[in-house]
Amino acid sequence: MTEDEALRSAGGRSFPSAAARAPGPAALKPGRSVAGELRTERTALAILDEIAREAAAPSADRPRRPAAEPAFILHARPWSESSLVADALTLRYGRVFLVAKGAKRPGSNLRGLLTPFSPLKLTWTGRKEAKILTRAEWMGVLPPLSGEALLSGFYVNELVLRLIRREDPHPGLFALYVRALEDLTGAEAIERQRALRRFEAGLLKLCGWEVRVSEGAGAPRYMLRTTGDLAGVAAGAVLPPGVRTWPREEVEDVLAGRLDRPQALRAAREIYRLAIELRLERPLSTRRVLADLKHL
């Protein structure tokens, strides 16, 4: 069902403790006091702890009627003069398409809430693809993304929108997403790249497209096949023009998540980029912007 048809029919990983993550003077951002930094960090950790607790609940405990469901808005757009439609990533229901009636009206309780990267609790009704959003509450404020980290966050959102089907829960995806946002916040360029590569690898694995060596283990170099797996390339082999290969050491580091060496990080970017492109019908918009900035 297309989005327009839906609208017509509608009318993990554990999180560290606060003590382990408390920032010291070296982590202080310009213009921020130690007390202010600690308050922001503790608020963020409280949100992440709540998400972690809820994520640990068995899937069988998922309520039939969603209420106060932890969620992040991936994308929202106007639907009419007074309403919005939005895609949200939720903890237990996966990616959900929501109609927020009257959300643009000055007196609406939803006004200003449906923005990316803000942790929310959402309540909705409906059995069709387009659900009716009835309530939204802020869970709290996470440290904001800005600059190139913000663009990286939009890239993460676009990956989820393009690779994840609506209402497919994908256990572990919500925690993976939250971890990516946390890792992008305040990170230097090199750490942002590592965070993006980890998210790409985790997302491909959750979708059943994990990049792995399927043939030619121990070969000196590897190539990515159109099936999304890596195959060994014998020394002296002649390949078609444009086929990219990577040394065994780099491939081993990438698959093991060892991205400290610049060569391994570069190989991870190239391998996961190609693996994702195999699953897309058209290029990613945010990747094009980030590529112009030479960070993706």
Where are these regions (language model features)?
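Non-catalytic alpha-helical scaffolds and adjoining flexible linkers that form interface surfaces
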Residues: 2-21, 25-85, 89-296
